[in-house]
Protein backbone atom coordinates (compact mmCIF):
# COMPACT_ATOMS: atom_id res chain seq x y z
CA UNK A 1 0.00 0.00 0.00
CA UNK A 2 1.56 3.30 -1.13
CA UNK A 3 0.53 6.35 0.86
CA UNK A 4 -0.32 9.57 -0.98
CA UNK A 5 2.19 11.54 1.12
CA UNK A 6 5.00 9.45 -0.44
CA UNK A 7 3.73 10.19 -3.96
CA UNK A 8 3.45 13.89 -3.08
CA UNK A 9 7.12 13.83 -2.04
CA UNK A 10 8.22 13.14 -5.65
CA UNK A 11 5.82 15.66 -7.26
CA UNK A 12 6.39 19.31 -8.17
CA UNK A 13 2.73 20.07 -7.47
CA UNK A 14 -0.55 18.23 -7.08
CA UNK A 15 -4.21 18.38 -7.98
CA UNK A 16 -5.78 16.74 -4.95
CA UNK A 17 -9.35 16.30 -3.85
CA UNK A 18 -10.79 14.68 -0.78
CA UNK A 19 -10.39 11.01 -1.34
CA UNK A 20 -8.13 8.03 -0.84
CA UNK A 21 -4.87 8.54 0.96
CA UNK A 22 -3.25 5.34 -0.28
CA UNK A 23 -2.97 3.19 -3.39
CA UNK A 24 -3.15 -0.60 -3.49
CA UNK A 25 -0.85 -0.75 -6.51
CA UNK A 26 1.14 1.22 -9.06
CA UNK A 27 0.73 0.45 -12.75
CA UNK A 28 2.18 1.66 -16.04
CA UNK A 29 -0.27 -0.36 -18.15
CA UNK A 30 -3.76 1.10 -18.56
CA UNK A 31 -5.12 -2.32 -19.55
CA UNK A 32 -4.36 -3.92 -16.17
CA UNK A 33 -7.03 -4.30 -13.52
CA UNK A 34 -6.08 -1.19 -11.57
CA UNK A 35 -8.62 -0.94 -8.77
CA UNK A 36 -7.42 1.85 -6.41
CA UNK A 37 -4.13 2.10 -8.34
CA UNK A 38 -1.77 4.95 -9.12
CA UNK A 39 -1.25 5.14 -12.90
CA UNK A 40 2.16 6.20 -14.21
CA UNK A 41 2.01 7.01 -17.94
CA UNK A 42 5.35 6.29 -19.60
CA UNK A 43 6.32 7.47 -23.06
CA UNK A 44 8.61 6.08 -25.74
CA UNK A 45 9.53 6.76 -29.34
CA UNK A 46 6.22 5.38 -30.64
CA UNK A 47 3.79 5.79 -27.76
CA UNK A 48 2.66 8.24 -25.11
CA UNK A 49 1.12 6.69 -22.01
CA UNK A 50 -0.66 9.96 -21.25
CA UNK A 51 -3.05 9.13 -24.10
CA UNK A 52 -4.32 6.14 -22.09
CA UNK A 53 -5.41 7.91 -18.92
CA UNK A 54 -9.12 7.40 -19.65
CA UNK A 55 -8.49 3.68 -20.13
CA UNK A 56 -6.58 3.55 -16.84
CA UNK A 57 -9.49 5.23 -15.06
CA UNK A 58 -11.91 2.71 -16.61
CA UNK A 59 -9.62 -0.04 -15.26
CA UNK A 60 -9.86 1.42 -11.75
CA UNK A 61 -6.99 3.90 -11.39
CA UNK A 62 -7.82 6.61 -8.85
CA UNK A 63 -4.82 8.91 -9.43
CA UNK A 64 -1.93 9.45 -11.83
CA UNK A 65 1.55 10.85 -11.98
CA UNK A 66 1.43 13.39 -14.82
CA UNK A 67 4.14 15.10 -16.87
CA UNK A 68 4.07 18.88 -16.45
CA UNK A 69 3.97 19.76 -20.16
CA UNK A 70 1.20 17.27 -21.05
CA UNK A 71 -2.31 18.72 -21.32
CA UNK A 72 -4.86 17.10 -19.01
CA UNK A 73 -7.79 15.77 -21.08
CA UNK A 74 -11.00 17.72 -20.53
CA UNK A 75 -12.86 14.44 -19.99
CA UNK A 76 -10.92 13.69 -16.79
CA UNK A 77 -13.08 14.34 -13.70
CA UNK A 78 -11.95 17.22 -11.48
CA UNK A 79 -11.96 14.79 -8.56
CA UNK A 80 -9.25 12.65 -10.19
CA UNK A 81 -5.97 13.18 -8.35
CA UNK A 82 -2.87 14.20 -10.33
CA UNK A 83 0.75 14.46 -9.23
CA UNK A 84 2.69 16.68 -11.65
CA UNK A 85 6.34 15.81 -12.34
CA UNK A 86 9.03 16.66 -14.89
CA UNK A 87 9.60 13.03 -15.91
CA UNK A 88 7.18 10.19 -15.00
CA UNK A 89 9.84 7.47 -15.36
CA UNK A 90 12.21 9.28 -13.02
CA UNK A 91 9.32 9.89 -10.59
CA UNK A 92 8.44 6.16 -10.70
CA UNK A 93 12.04 5.26 -9.89
CA UNK A 94 12.32 7.83 -7.12
CA UNK A 95 9.01 6.72 -5.61
CA UNK A 96 10.21 3.09 -5.64
CA UNK A 97 13.46 4.04 -3.94
CA UNK A 98 11.63 5.94 -1.20
CA UNK A 99 9.14 3.13 -0.68
CA UNK A 100 11.98 0.59 -0.47
CA UNK A 101 13.59 2.72 2.24
CA UNK A 102 10.28 2.96 4.12
CA UNK A 103 9.54 -0.79 4.07
CA UNK A 104 13.25 -1.52 4.65
CA UNK A 105 13.41 -5.24 3.82
CA UNK A 106 16.63 -7.22 3.52
CA UNK A 107 17.15 -7.06 -0.26
CA UNK A 108 18.80 -9.82 -2.25
CA UNK A 109 19.72 -8.64 -5.74
CA UNK A 110 20.18 -11.29 -8.42
CA UNK A 111 21.88 -10.64 -11.76
CA UNK A 112 23.87 -12.49 -14.41
CA UNK A 113 23.74 -13.49 -18.05
CA UNK A 114 21.30 -16.34 -17.43
CA UNK A 115 19.66 -18.25 -14.62
CA UNK A 116 18.38 -15.14 -12.82
CA UNK A 117 14.71 -16.09 -12.74
CA UNK A 118 15.33 -19.67 -11.60
CA UNK A 119 17.74 -18.47 -8.90
CA UNK A 120 15.22 -15.85 -7.76
CA UNK A 121 12.50 -18.47 -7.44
CA UNK A 122 14.77 -20.85 -5.49
CA UNK A 123 15.87 -18.11 -3.06
CA UNK A 124 12.23 -17.08 -2.59
CA UNK A 125 11.28 -20.64 -1.59
CA UNK A 126 14.33 -21.07 0.67
CA UNK A 127 13.37 -17.93 2.57
CA UNK A 128 9.86 -19.25 3.21
CA UNK A 129 7.76 -17.52 0.55
CA UNK A 130 4.87 -15.14 1.14
CA UNK A 131 3.78 -13.08 3.02
CA UNK A 132 7.16 -12.01 4.43
CA UNK A 133 9.22 -12.64 1.30
CA UNK A 134 8.58 -10.66 -1.89
CA UNK A 135 10.06 -11.38 -5.32
CA UNK A 136 10.16 -9.98 -8.81
CA UNK A 137 7.09 -11.10 -10.77
CA UNK A 138 8.12 -12.99 -13.90
CA UNK A 139 11.22 -11.28 -15.20
CA UNK A 140 10.34 -7.61 -14.58
CA UNK A 141 14.01 -6.86 -14.15
CA UNK A 142 14.72 -3.59 -15.96
CA UNK A 143 14.53 0.15 -15.21
CA UNK A 144 10.71 -0.08 -15.16
CA UNK A 145 10.24 -3.58 -13.75
CA UNK A 146 12.49 -3.16 -10.71
CA UNK A 147 10.61 -0.04 -9.52
CA UNK A 148 7.28 -1.86 -10.03
CA UNK A 149 8.65 -4.83 -8.07
CA UNK A 150 9.66 -2.60 -5.18
CA UNK A 151 6.35 -0.74 -5.21
CA UNK A 152 4.39 -4.01 -5.03
CA UNK A 153 6.06 -5.10 -1.76
CA UNK A 154 3.67 -5.50 1.15
CA UNK A 155 4.50 -3.33 4.17
CA UNK A 156 5.19 -6.42 6.29
CA UNK A 157 7.83 -7.66 3.82
CA UNK A 158 11.05 -8.81 5.55
CA UNK A 159 12.95 -10.01 2.47
CA UNK A 160 12.83 -8.82 -1.15
CA UNK A 161 14.36 -11.01 -3.85
CA UNK A 162 14.93 -8.64 -6.77
CA UNK A 163 16.00 -9.77 -10.22
CA UNK A 164 18.11 -7.24 -12.13
CA UNK A 165 18.72 -7.48 -15.86
CA UNK A 166 20.91 -5.45 -18.14
CA UNK A 167 20.73 -4.54 -21.81
CA UNK A 168 23.07 -1.54 -21.77
CA UNK A 169 26.08 -0.29 -19.83
CA UNK A 170 25.28 1.27 -16.47
CA UNK A 171 21.86 -0.34 -16.03
CA UNK A 172 22.88 -2.53 -13.06
CA UNK A 173 24.29 0.57 -11.36
CA UNK A 174 20.90 2.33 -11.67
CA UNK A 175 18.95 -0.74 -10.51
CA UNK A 176 21.29 -1.16 -7.53
CA UNK A 177 20.68 2.44 -6.49
CA UNK A 178 16.93 1.77 -6.55
CA UNK A 179 16.89 -1.64 -4.83
CA UNK A 180 19.93 -1.10 -2.55
CA UNK A 181 20.69 -4.82 -2.22
CA UNK A 182 22.10 -6.06 1.09
CA UNK A 183 23.35 -9.18 -0.68
CA UNK A 184 24.15 -9.74 -4.36
CA UNK A 185 24.06 -13.01 -6.27
CA UNK A 186 25.70 -13.11 -9.70
CA UNK A 187 24.66 -16.29 -11.52
CA UNK A 188 27.30 -16.06 -14.25
CA UNK A 189 28.64 -13.57 -16.74
CA UNK A 190 29.01 -14.42 -20.41
CA UNK A 191 30.13 -12.40 -23.40
CA UNK A 192 27.19 -11.06 -25.41
CA UNK A 193 26.67 -12.94 -28.66
CA UNK A 194 26.61 -10.63 -31.64
CA UNK A 195 25.01 -11.69 -34.89
CA UNK A 196 26.12 -10.49 -38.30
Regions found by a protein language model. Give the residues of each.
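N-terminal leader/targeting and accessory segments in enzymes
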Residues: 1-94
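Phosphate-binding loop of NTP-binding sites
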Residues: 8, 89-196
Amino acid sequence: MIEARLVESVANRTRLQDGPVSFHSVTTDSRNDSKTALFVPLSGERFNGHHYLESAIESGAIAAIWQENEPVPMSIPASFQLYFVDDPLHALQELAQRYRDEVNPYVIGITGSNGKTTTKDIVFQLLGGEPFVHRTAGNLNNHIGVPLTLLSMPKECKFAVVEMGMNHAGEISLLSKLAKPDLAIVTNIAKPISST
